[in-house]
């Protein structure tokens, strides 16, 4: 019985390792956000040091900057609304992240996550249903299939329920019913230039348009919906690609 359990445990460990390796990048990664390009290490390099990587998106539309701590230190300081930080490395596998108003001592939200060595993660700070703050931690899988572009949409706006996402002019949606605080994972698409149309469940509301996005092969594009219930929805956009081409999300 002991030998059987040991064998099963070993198989599970191998499977987990293979799954985690599949999300790693072989090369360093260029991220374009807000017109700025940053470079982060390869997943293989980070894994060799027993580290993972994490970044922060401030989707809290309160016009206040935020700090986030984790791994027993401050990871991000004075991050303004709609800002996407560069990746930083963390060494612990179980990390409790805490969200603070900038330069304040009392946290307003926290979240714990199991971080796999060599993997990349995005923390999204977003409003909760009661006007406070919460955090979602999402794993980044940024390498699309050969010749494809990759897209994901994160719904961080309490005013948008069950979002449907489509490329204008195409019959079938890319994603359906993305609820608030959720994302529907990534989808690989044929490279194209198109307007992304996002609709909530209110038939009387106008669609949210991200116009003339140039989806390039080899790139992963993220769109974050943000805004309070009483204010217009805004979008935060950024893209990632393994080095070898660093041109970013084109909005004309």
Give the ranges of each region predicted by the language model.
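Sec-dependent bacterial lipoprotein signal peptides
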Residues: 1-18
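Intrinsically disordered, low-complexity polar regions and short flexible loop motifs
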Residues: 20-252
């Amino acid at each position: 019985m002991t030998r059987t359990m040991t064998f099963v445990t070993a198989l599970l460990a191998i499977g987990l390792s293979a799954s985690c390796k599949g999300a790693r990048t072989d090369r360093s990664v260029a991220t374009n956000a807000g017109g700025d390009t940053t470079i982060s290490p390869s997943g293989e390099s980070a894994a060799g040091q027993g580290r993972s990587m994490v970044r922060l998106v401030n989707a809290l539309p309160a016009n206040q900057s935020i700090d986030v701590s984790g791994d027993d230190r401050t990871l991000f300081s004075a991050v303004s609304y709609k800002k996407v930080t560069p990746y930083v490395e963390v060494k612990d596998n179980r990390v409790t992240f805490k969200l603070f108003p900038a330069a304040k001592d009392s946290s307003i939200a926290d979240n714990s996550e199991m971080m796999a060595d060599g993997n990349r993660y995005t923390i999204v700070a977003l409003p909760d249903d009661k006007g406070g703050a919460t955090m979602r931690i999402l794993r980044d899988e940024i390498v699309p299939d050969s010749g494809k572009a990759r897209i994901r949409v994160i719904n961080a706006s309490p005013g948008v329920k069950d979002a449907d996402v489509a490329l204008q002019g195409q019959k079938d949606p890319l994603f359906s019913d993305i609820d608030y605080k959720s994302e529907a994972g990534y989808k690989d698409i044929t490279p194209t230039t198109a307007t992304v149309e996002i609709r909530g469940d209110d038939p009387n509301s106008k669609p949210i348009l991200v116009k003339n996005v140039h989806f390039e092969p080899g790139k992963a594009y993220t769109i974050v919906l943000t805004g309070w219930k009483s204010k217009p929805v805004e979008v935060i956009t950024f893209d990632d690609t393994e080095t070898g081409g660093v041109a970013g999300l084109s909005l004309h």
